[in-house]
C-alpha cells in the first residue's frame, strides 16, 4: 500500500469497535485553558457516569485565582455504544469551554491486563521493540509530532525492552518481567499499574479533543495486547535490530519519519479487519509530512 492509496481517506466514528469483549478501558484527557471547575460542573450535569476533571500540575495554571486546565479521568469503560456516546459528550464539553490541546497535554489510555495472557508478555515486548517508531508516530494523533512533555512523561522504552530481550532466559514469567519494568512509570508504556489497578497504561499518545482519535487509539492498543497472545514473532528481525541498535534508536524526535513498509507489517499483524488497518495507517501517515516541525501543529484533518 502507498500513501496515495489512503491520503484522502477520512476516519469515521463508530458505534462500537470490533475488539475482545473482555476489554476494559480507561482514559486520561489532559487539556489547557478551559476553567477546571466549569468543566467539572458540565461533566456532572451532562453525564450519568463518573467522568471527573481534576487538577494536574503539568497542565494547570491559575489565572486571576481561577484554575484553568486539568485532566479528565474516565470511569472503567467497556466497548459499548454508551461509552462512545459519552466520549463525544466529554469532547464537546471541552471544545465548548474553549479547552486547548498544547504540547504539554498527554492522552493516556489504560487497557485491562486481562487481555494479555501470562505467558505472552515477552511477545508484547518484542512487538513493541520492533515497531516502537511506528507506534509513537501513530499515537501523535492529529498532530505532526510528539508533544514536548513526552520526553519527561512518556519516554521511549526501546532500550529497556532491548535488555529484557537480550536476557530473555532470566525472565520466564510475567511476574519477573513486571518486577523489572515497574520501577519507572513515566514511559511510553507503563507496567506499574499491573497489580494495583490491573491495567497496562499507554502514555505515548498526544491528547485530543477529537473523539475519533481517541477511539482509533483505543482500537489499536486493545488489538495490540490481544494479538500478542498468538503472534508469531519474527526472531530474525529481532536479532537484526539487536545487532544494529545504537543510541539513536532511543531518540523519539526521529520517530516522525514515515516507514510505510513497517507500518503495513504492524497493521497486518494487529488487525484482521481491513477498515481497522486503513484507519490505523491513515492516522499513522497523517498528511505525509516527515520533517519534524518546530511548532506543535495539527495535520490536515483526516477524521469525519
Indicate where each model-derived feature is located.
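Terminal catalytic/cofactor-binding subdomain
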Residues: 1-97
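Aromatic/basic-lined ligand-recognition segments
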Residues: 24-28, 119-208
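A common structural junction motif
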Residues: 46-52, 94-101, 132-135, 222-232
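Helical (often loop-to-helix) elements that flank the catalytic cores of nucleotide-handling enzymes
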Residues: 80-90, 114-140, 210-225, 289, ...
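Flexible helix-coil linker/hinge segments at domain or subdomain boundaries
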Residues: 100, 133-148, 227-283, 288-290
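Histidine-centered divalent-metal-coordination microenvironment in nucleic-acid enzymes
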Residues: 100-116, 199-203
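Long, repeat-rich segments with strong aromatic
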Residues: 195-200, 204-233
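Acidic, glycine-enriched catalytic cores built around paired aspartates
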Residues: 283-304
